[in-house]
Amino acid sequence: MNTIPSLALQPKGRAPTASTNALIMKTVARFVYIITFVLLPLAGRAAPHLSDHIRPFVGTQGEGNTYPGPSAPFGMIQLSPDTDRDLWETASGYEYSDTSIMGFTLTHLTGTGIPDLGDFLFMPQIGEPKLLPGTKENPDAGYRARYSHEQESASAGYYKVKLLNNNVTVELAAGERAGMMRFTFPQSDSASILTDLQHFLSGKRFKLIWSHLRVEDNSTLTGFHLVNGWAKERYLYFAARYSKPFDHYRIMSSGNEVKYDSFRTYRFRSRNEAAGTNLQFLAEYKTRPDEVIMVKVAVSAISAANALQNLDSEIPKADWNFEKIVAATREKWDRELARIEIDGSDWDKETFYTGMYHAFLAPNLYEDVTGEYRGMDSNIHHAKGFKNYAVFSLWDTFRATHPLFALIQSQRDSDMIQSLLAHYDQSADHLLPMWSLQGNETWCMIGYHAVPVIADGYLKGVKGFDADRAFQAMKTTAMNPDYDGAAAYAKLGWVPCDLENESASKTLEYAFDDYCIAQMAKALGKKADYDYFMKRAGSYQNVFDPSTGQVRGKDSHGNWRTPFDPHAYGEGAQADFTEATATQYSFYNPQDVPAMIALMGGKEKFVQQLDALFNYKEPVKAQAAEDIQGRIGEYWHGNEPSHHIIYLYCYAGQPWKAAQRLHEVIKTQYGNKPNSLSGNDDCGQMSAWYIFTALGFYPVCPASDYYVLGSPAIKKAVVHLSNGKIFTMVAENLSDQNIYVQSVKLNGRNWTTPFLPYAELKNGGSLVFTMGPQPDKEWGTNCAVPR
């Protein structure tokens, strides 16, 4: 080690020699150099943040349907630009390919295939205010503004864009329930900020029922609207505080200023308050060059008073520190991302941590600082002992998103499970949610997939909820005779295609959910329930046609649907499958893959059918499935029914084929660019698939006691489990060429089976893959499923 000589070591009374002086000067010069050019720059440079790797634009172009604006983890408010309101391509409000922005709204869904939210549009203007948005083809006709991606940026907790029409810079920041918009105006005698209550993401078919605006003082606005959208009855309030008092303000109703006019009305009409179905507000100013006006905003499903309370509790009245909000949210993201620390390239880190970011955007906190929330019954409830969440895309997220939460987000998973149970308590039909959205059941998709979320959580050690009460909710939901062919399913063992659409898919997904109920019953010592639901869990065989080797629609008399095309995609009354084909759904029996393999003629024939799926040559793109991309033959990674299929190779003793396909999907359908998602992210499911797959294992069968080993895509990961244990994955020799598993060691022991027991994972330890460029066809052939 180099040391700096000390003058104190010179002999007493002896002057330093010339050579000693030279050495001292040289050493001092080196010391000054180190301080000036090494230590000081490091002192001024922040340590790397995991949130620096987040790329919010991923998924905003094409089918991903994500939004670029800021949100706290699982936050209640999501400030983001909207470029359209009427198309499924802008279900999140924003499409990267659009060239103009309608405005900036306070709430957004992430990755869904149906639009909703996009509440309360704010838009700065210069000149005579415009009250209509105009069109994408002619944005100058309205308050839309052109923009360029060269003058747009986004990072964790922050968004910025320059509006080219009016030279206004817009910046957005968001906390959990409140956020801030910062507008930098040019000099103008006619600057304004429009608030449009009629705006929401409508898909051309939804309706604003009622709205209300109130000017609380010369810098505070509150409002409300009731929307009949995807969520049938959605109440939302907002509060906004402006950093600069209004020079002038106007409430507009159907394009006219709300004010007293003795010739038009015989009653006094306040200019400070209005109700109707087409309300807008204009805050008008004279601005100096580069003058900044900020607007603090918050939302509530309860009342305007609660929205103000949410706002003032998160951003106090006197606090206009925009950077403080950005920094606080960025810090929250750093804490969440630190649950998994990885080693890899910049591409690896940006792809992985953006995936975690998307997986942790939803479900959304749905309660005020008071603990109040609007429930399924439209009444006001108080969340006692838990935080209430909403936006449960369960048909998607039961597969990988919630299993991820069970491992590394157990407290939130517990709160989410309690939110599902609260929904059940408030449901007129005594059902757990199917697809819940801000206190509403949308009845979207199929199955009763709150069941695997609860069962997997409980069996993975998630605590804090009443397991017996949860089991009763699961059982009651499954036995409800009025739900989607459930009565016929209970009687016949399948959902008949002459009585119910998407019947084959419903049969298969009900059977899986019943398996999950059985596992919960087993854990609780309820043997009769276990036996009953395990019998129902075997319903796959009831819709498997041996003559075709495929799952097929069957009517109430036991006759197969004719004609039958295993590759046909359909929706509606004549469709037996949900957003998929018979070939794809024929591989869905995750609760008993060995039985499925046996029905298909054994492992060799099963692998042949898997190969045929990937090698299928599609003559024409399937109709009505334009948003389902990521196609490799008839494997469609852009939609959830395919997500587990690659891992089925492992059950048949050929995990090297899984490795090839997994890396193909990762390299072609994920990344760090706006178009890097091949399908709707669906509240994080597409992203959660990547997270698990990159780690080298995947929950093919949630609520089981094992994961399936695949082929890792990152060199090292340290997973901080919710129970405090640390699980480390290492992929030795991993490269773009070395994608095949040669051997595995689990906690130092040779591991020859392609299954990872949860009992091993939960205690922490290490999983070490050795990778190579060619398949090792000996490893993983021991494919007996853990029992």
Regions found by a protein language model. Name each.
Residues 7-8, 53:
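Ser/Thr/Pro/Gly-rich low-complexity, intrinsically disordered segments
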Residues 9-18:
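Short, low-complexity intrinsically disordered segments enriched in A/P/G/S/L with frequent Arg
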Residues 26-34:
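Sec-dependent signal peptide recognition
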Residues 36-45:
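Hydrophobic h-region of N-terminal signal peptides that target proteins for export
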Residues 47-402, 406-452, 456-508, 516-542, ...:
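Accessory carbohydrate-recognition regions in carbohydrate-active enzymes
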